[in-house]
């Protein structure tokens, strides 16, 4: 599946690697061009020391990378979730699954970040929350991890489960 991960911090990079290893076509989006260039040339994220990013990973600073994706992962810092969701709203294909993996709540509204995404993109795309006791460096180093994919529609949560899960990354579902 064509997937774009929005946010190239440690968590976004670790999940992009996981999705790539699971056989998907993955693009990792960075807000800063210099960051994207560094990832492309060094094949390492400074936040995940020693974890090699394969040549197959694509890098961009262009939000149009979400066009044609079956899945978009929102891994931006919490303060950037609303603005990023607003910018990609018109670029997303209807039905694209949007997975919220950023932790926290929005400062001014006290909304969960999944609610912020839903407020910005409306009902155009289903939103799934992927969360649990997990750390980027552990996922990047292939340490066994368990998380939950929660969605209003259990079938959508199961689709996310299928895309993310492997022998070391266990995904449970919830509605």
Where in this protein do the model-derived segments appear?
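NAD(P)+-binding Rossmann beta1-loop-alpha1 motif at the extreme N-terminus of oxidoreductases
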Residues: 1-52, 58-61, 87
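Generic secondary-structure signature for well-ordered alpha-helical cores
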Residues: 21-24, 41-44, 90-93, 122, ...
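Short, hinge-like loop/turn segments at secondary-structure boundaries
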Residues: 43-48, 115-117, 144-148
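Carboxylate- and glycine-rich phosphate/diphosphate-binding segment that chelates Mg2+/Mn2+
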Residues: 136-175
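Rossmann-like NAD(P)(H) cofactor-binding subdomain of soluble oxidoreductases
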Residues: 53, 59-67, 71-144, 160
């Amino acid at each position: 599946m064509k997937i774009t991960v929005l946010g190239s911090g440690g968590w976004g990079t670790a999940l992009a690697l996981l999705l790539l290893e699971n056989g998907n076509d993955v693009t990792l989006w960075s807000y800063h061009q210099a960051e994207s260039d560094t990832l492309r040339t060094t094949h390492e994220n400074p936040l995940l020391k020693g974890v090699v990013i394969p040549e197959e990973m694509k890098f961009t600073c262009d939000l149009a990378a979400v066009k044609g994706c079956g899945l978009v992962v929102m891994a931006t810092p919490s303060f950037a979730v609303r603005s990023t969701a607003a910018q990609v709203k018109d670029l997303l294909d209807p039905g694209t699954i949007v997975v919220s993996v950023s932790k926290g709540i929005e400062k001014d509204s006290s909304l969960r970040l999944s609610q912020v995404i839903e407020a910005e993109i409306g009902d155009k795309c289903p939103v799934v929350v992927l969360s649990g006791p997990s750390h980027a460096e552990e996922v990047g180093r292939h340490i066994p991890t368990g998380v939950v994919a929660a969605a209003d529609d259990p079938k959508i949560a199961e689709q996310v489960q299928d895309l993310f899960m492997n022998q070391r990354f266990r995904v449970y579902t919830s509605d």
